[in-house]
Amino acid sequence: MKSENVSKKKSILEWAKAIVIAVVLALLIRNFIFAPYVVDGDSMYPTLHNRERVFVNMTVKYIGEFDRGDIVVLNGDDVHYVKRIIGLPGDTVEMKNDQLYINGKKVDEPYLAANKKRAKQDGFDHLTDDFGPVKVPDNKYFVMGDNRRNSMDSRNGLGLFTKKQIAGTSKFVFYPFNEMRKTN
């Protein structure tokens, strides 16, 4: 009887140890490797839709660099924003006649094709209002939403973001399940 109790206690301890290890690993993964986020709003439409869930790669924040064109989750004061990095530290960003210029060079934005077409159908002669040039300071990033007519971003209220304020890069949509896809 005594050996049966010892065996049960040993089994319970083994299970408890396995559960603790699993919880610690889950917390480490969630806080330092990748995390789920909910897209709130239409500022990235049609690339991302309102209420979609994305996985965010957080490792780039610690062991890499962000690239122009990355879709990122930003930590705001009370909310998270999902935007696209347009300008890197040291860049000069300008929009003229619906054409993006970085450091004086034209930049192609193929992800805006559907929105540009829709803007013209809606009677607008351009998708993105002219702005700039804006010099992006060191340690800051200039971001914009893909739905330029319906996005608060670095142009109009959110300002520039530091690397510390960027949670990570969105790599794919995982929900709704029937619309899983890469985001970049």
Swiss-Prot record:
Signal peptide: none annotated. It catalyses: Cleavage of hydrophobic, N-terminal signal or leader sequences from secreted and periplasmic proteins. One of its GO terms (biological process) is signal peptide processing. It is found in: Cell membrane. Residues 1-18 are cytoplasmic. InterPro entries: LexA/Signal_pep-like_sf, Pept_S26A_signal_pept_1, Pept_S26A_signal_pept_1_CS, Pept_S26A_signal_pept_1_Lys-AS, Pept_S26A_signal_pept_1_Ser-AS, Peptidase_S26. Changing residue 84 to H: Strongly reduced activity. Changing residue 145 to A: Strongly reduced activity. Changing residue 43 to A/V: Loss of activity. GO terms for cellular component: plasma membrane. Belongs to the peptidase S26 family. This is Signal peptidase I S. It comes from Bacillus subtilis (strain 168).
